[in-house]
Amino acid sequence: MFYQTIYPTYQVFVALGVSCIITLVLMPLFIKLMKKEGVGQQVRADGPQQHLVKQGTPTMGGVVMLVSILLTCIALAQWNTDLILAMAAMLLTGSLGLLDDIESVAHGRSLGLTASQKMAGLITISVAFCLAAVNIWGITPIIAFPGGLEINLGILTTTVNLGGNVLSIPWLYLFFVFLLMAGLSNAVNLTDGLDGLAGGCVMVVMIFMAAVAFRYGESSLAVFAASIAGACIGFLWFNSYPASIFMGDTGSLAWGAAFAALAVLTKTEVVSLVMGGLFIIEALSVIIQVVSYKATKKRVFLMAPLHHHFEKLGWNETKVVFRFWIISGAFAALGFALYFQLH
């Protein structure tokens, strides 16, 4: 709408500010609505005891953030194929998270959809995204590593003729994109366990991803990433300790999918794993804990994900959050530095 009247560099900063402002304006109204309807977070009974006071805190704040991002991109971004693909991945995964949140609230429990239901949704979304990225946007099924190493994941490709149109199905790359999108979505979701933790970490990563997208020549994706960062900044005003609202799976699953989509569309699939290193560590802590307990009946961590381990060690919630923000920023900066080894 207004993208032609604003210099591309400024679009990114304006998008961050506009998305932040929209979130700041709409979130109080949403919090009031959630309180009126009695929609609140269900807290794990086996979690840290100090978290029990969070029971009933309004949730699904990710809805407002998604609306803010969509409105910002409508106003400031050029809607080309790459933006449509990234937006679709985010909104569809956010919708999956919304269903999970609704299920959780409706049944008064901390768990919503079953693991198989979530996985089926993530498989569908990631496969559709990958096929569209390869066949419509022309993304090559090659992953690049810093230093020049490249691995071709298109060596096992099936072509299907659909009424004169050829559909390429790169099986290895398809599986890789599924792992990336499902992995990052769940990793961000696992990180969302303390007030301000996931929102702050996503904000930091998306600022760096906006810089990556802009340097890659994708100004629309830069606006998209900046609008997510802006929405996170606005959200943190209400989610900082003690939180007035949580983003819910609506937000956490959506940000992971958006991160994965940006990584694929800017061909930074490997570097993105470094930039999102904090999310990866959080997810790995859960995997290690589960595997260790099943194999030896012993736990490696006092509690998983990792942020709860440090709470159990006596760190207060805000100290864990701020230190994890610093770690997330360090990983994002390292990934950004490695990006220059790709291009």
Language model segments and positions:
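Hydrophobic alpha-helical transmembrane segments
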Residues: 95, 119-128
